[in-house]
Every structure is written in C-alpha cells, then in structure tokens.
C-alpha cells in the first residue's frame, strides 16, 4: 500500500510503503474467525498508522521502519495480536 485507505482482508499479507507520506490505514473485521493477517513495512520514510475496526490489544498499530511487521488473528469479534516485530508499537486502549 502506498496511500491511505482500507487494508484488504481478502489477501493474507499487505506490504506497506510510506515513502510518499504518513499513511492512515484501516482494517475491517474479517468475515471469519481464524483469519490471519500479516502487515509488513517494506519501504519507510513516514509512519503508517493502522486502526482496526475492533482491536483487542489497543486502538492503533504504528509502523515506522522497514521490517516492522504485525501478525494479527481475527477471533470472530476483534483482531488479536499474535506477534509484533521490533519497533512496531501498539497504542493501548484509554
């Protein structure tokens, strides 16, 4: 992805390129529990802020450098974090 918008839930892996500016990305709920989504930053320059519709681990996930990766699992209600690569940050629910 090179522009702000919705991350596809129909493909397993999304590659993020923020060299053109800050990205505001959304992630809708998956239709099926057990869906796994991997998001990885392949080209950096700016932050990519990901806001899932329902996120059990916080409110947003921010990536800012090449290699930042998150693996998420949809539990039927919300996205759970299976793993977050070094440097990626979660914003806790206030």
Regions found by a protein language model. Name each.
Residues 53-61:
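Extracellular beta-sheet repeat scaffolds used for adhesion and glycan interaction
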Residues 41, 61-65:
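Glycine-rich loops and low-complexity Gly/Arg-rich segments
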Residues 1-52, 74-94:
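Exposed extracellular interaction/assembly regions and N-terminal maturation sites
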Residues 66-76:
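Extracellular disulfide-bonded cysteine-rich modules/repeats
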């Amino acid at each position: 992805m090179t522009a702000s918008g919705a991350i596809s839930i129909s493909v397993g892996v999304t590659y993020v390129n923020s060299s053109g500016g800050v990205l505001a990305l959304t992630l809708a709920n998956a239709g099926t529990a057990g869906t796994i989504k991997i998001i990885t930053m392949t080209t950096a320059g700016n932050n990519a802020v990901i806001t899932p519709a329902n996120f059990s681990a916080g409110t947003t996930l921010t990536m800012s450098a090449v290699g930042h990766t998150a693996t998420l699992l949809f539990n039927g209600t919300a996205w759970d974090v299976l793993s977050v690569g070094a440097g990626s940050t979660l914003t806790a629910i206030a």
